[in-house]
Amino acid sequence: MKKNKLQIEQLSKKLNSYNSLQELVVPSIGWIKTIRTSLGMSLEQLGGNMGVTRQSAQNLEKREKDGSATLKALEGAGRSIDMKLVYGFVPVDGSLEQLIERKAKQIATQIVMRTSGTMKLEDQENSEERIEKAIEERTAEIIDEMPKILWD
């Protein structure tokens, strides 16, 4: 478990450097065409730099716009205009730790509420405060154990 936690911490630090990019809006015509036209570069020049035809360069711009361009093709286009493709993922929760905590709390809530429902049927209902405390405790246990059910 300790090795896992260390890996998560290290990866989280790397991913955190991408957090500011979440706000970045992809140009509606795609990055390649936006950069190419901003630089005053023609499709012929882009294609020539990439070692492909004008039509192939144009097709790549279209594929990027519709989301079907490969990373390899985008890297090639980037190299041809002296740029580097940067690729990564950003947790929607802000960090890996927050993602894990949210998933663990969902599972903990299901477990505790199922148990609480059974106890209610037996006239042994817990208070809201006790239920919240049980959810917090179970969440901490799940985070420590990191079971595979987090990702079901």
Residue ranges and their predicted role:
Residues 19-20, 30, 60-64:
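Short, contiguous strand/loop micro-motifs
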Residues 3, 30-49:
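Short basic helix-loop element that most often maps to the first helix and adjoining turn
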Residues 82-98:
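Short C-terminal boundary/hinge segments that cap the last helix of small helical domains
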